[in-house]
């Protein structure tokens, strides 16, 4: 009888402790959309990726061009991606380098989406099966990574990139990396 109660009690206490730790982090002003990532401080995973329109193959050297870049994970099935798309177009017009990762999507739908809504990406990579997303630790779309000019990931953000997120969170990191290059 005591053993039957011990497992649920331990599980309950573990969940309660995790909840309290997260509440404390939020109260201290930590950004709940900033996901911890084992890849922060490490290079973009090495993988051969195909470009959406030209079927050209890229390696992680794409992220080693000497300038920082946003790696934006998106999909046509993602309503939040639709919401952020107009703002990404604005950033691209301002000169922000953005590489798109079309995540678990159908290529014809993605090409039509970009034709109809505009293409903010310098390069659009296909990840139809989600294997590169898995390597990045992506669990949904949209997610955005800030990568420096040497291909090292500096930040990971889950959610839509909008004016507030850009100016308060992402832009300071992007600008700092731009100055260092």
From Swiss-Prot:
- All copies of domain Thioredoxin, residue ranges: 38-175
- Listed as disulfide-bonded, the cysteine pairs are 78-81
Could you tell me which CDD domains the record lists for this protein?
A: TlpA_like_DsbE
- Of which family is this protein a member? Belongs to the thioredoxin family. DsbE subfamily.
Question: Species name for this entry?
Answer: Haemophilus influenzae (strain ATCC 51907 / DSM 11121 / KW20 / Rd)
Origin organism lineage: Bacteria, Pseudomonadati, Pseudomonadota, Gammaproteobacteria, Pasteurellales
Name used for this protein in its record? Thiol:disulfide interchange protein DsbE
Specify whether Disulfide bond is a keyword of the entry. Answer: yes
**GO CC annotation:** outer membrane-bounded periplasmic space; plasma membrane
Mapped to this chain, the residue ranges on the Cytoplasmic side of the membrane are: 1-4
């Amino acid at each position: 009888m005591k053993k039957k109660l011990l497992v649920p009690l331990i599980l309950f206490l573990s969940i309660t402790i995790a909840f309290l730790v997260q509440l404390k982090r939020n109260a201290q002003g930590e950004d709940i959309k900033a996901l911890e990532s084992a890849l922060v401080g490490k290079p973009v995973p090495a993988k051969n990726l195909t470009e959406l329109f030209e079927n050209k193959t890229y390696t992680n050297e794409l992220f080693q061009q000497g300038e920082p870049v946003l790696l934006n994970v998106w999909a046509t099935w993602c309503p939040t991606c639709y919401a952020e798309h107009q703002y990404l177009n604005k950033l691209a017009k301002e000169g922000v380098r953005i590489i798109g990762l079309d995540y678990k999507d159908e290529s014809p739908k993605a090409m039509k989406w970009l034709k109809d809504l505009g293409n903010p990406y310098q390069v659009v990579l296909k990840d139809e099966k989600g294997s590169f997303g898995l390597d990045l630790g992506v669990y949904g779309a949209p997610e955005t990574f800030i990568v420096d000019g040497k291909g090292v990931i500096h930040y990971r953000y889950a959610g839509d990139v909008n004016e507030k997120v850009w100016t308060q969170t992402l832009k300071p990191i992007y600008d700092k990396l731009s100055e260092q290059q």
